[in-house]
Every structure is written in C-alpha cells, then in structure tokens.
Amino acid sequence: QKEDGSHMGESLDIVRYFYRQDSSALDEAVRPEIQAWVEVFADWGNRLIMPRDVQLDLPEFAAESSVAYFKGKKEAWLEASFEQLLQETPRYLAQAQEALRVLDGLIAPNADYVNGKHLSMEDILVFPLLRNLSMVKGVAYPDNVAHYVRAMSQAAKIPLFFDRAV
C-alpha cells in the first residue's frame, strides 16, 4: 500500500514505485531479443519451476493449505499435474539448456548486468527467472549466465537454490 492508500498489483509497478521514491531512474530499456527470451521462458520455465516451488521448504509454503492452494491453481493453469511435469523434466530441461545457450550470447563475458553496464529492467525481468531455474537439479548455466546470476545474487543478497535443487 502506498502513502495515499492506493495499492499496486503488479510487481513491475512496485519496482518502478521504489525507484521513484529513491529519486533514481530505472533504465527501462529492454532489448527485443531479451524480451523475446523472457516470453519463450514462460513456455517451459513454469513447467520446470512450479512443481519444485512447493518442495523447497520455502516460507510461503510452510502451511499445507498454501501448498494445496498453489498446487491446485497452477496445475489447472498448466493443464498438467505437478507429478506429470516432474516426469517430463528431461524434455523441459533440454529446452532450458537451449534457452540458456541463447541468453549466454546476449550477456557480455564477466558482466554483472544483463546489458553489461548497469542495473536495468532487463535484470528485473531476467534474474528472477534464472534464480528460480536454479531450483532445477541438472540445469547447467553457461559461463556468461553463470557469472551474471552469481554476481546479481551477491549484489542483491538473494540466495540461489542450487544447494537444494530438485
């Protein structure tokens, strides 16, 4: 809730709001190839990530009712059970590896930011996807992506899930 009592429903609206409060401008430029990558990720990424969300002992899933609600909503949306999606991991993991190879070519070597210069909307869009993908056992990040995701994790103090990947 904002000071005026209004609410923000979209996470990107929240990001923009905090940047305005800090009097700094977020570079909102997103290269078309990064936008396309994010959109393609949604096709297979959710099928890898969502079944694992509830298996990682995340605080938001501490209550069984939270797990049941999330599972019911997401299975209906994905039109597949989490069990079925976990069995299809090899198929979606192959798509993930190909997408990561593409993304690797869009990130400069040793870059701490997707655009290679500074924090931007590209990071706001890409980092959460890569962080969530780290919960998938067997995912292998190519060099540029691996450097980026670790650098962003450290800078943001947001841990990755490699140590408990499923």
Report each predicted region and the residues it spans.
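GST-like fold's C-terminal all-alpha helical module
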Residues: 43-151
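A general structural signal marking secondary-structure boundaries and capping sites
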Residues: 22, 107-110, 156
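Alpha-helical oligomerization segments
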Residues: 139, 147-166
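Aromatic-enriched hydrophobic runs in primary sequence
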Residues: 1, 33-34, 90, 112, ...
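Small-side-chain structural scaffolding
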Residues: 11, 122, 161-162
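Non-transmembrane alpha-helical segments in soluble domains
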Residues: 12-15, 19, 35-38, 97-100, ...
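GST-like domain detector, emphasizing the conserved glutathione-binding G-site
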Residues: 1-72
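Short, hydrophobic secondary-structure boundary micro-motifs
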Residues: 26-29, 113-116, 160-164
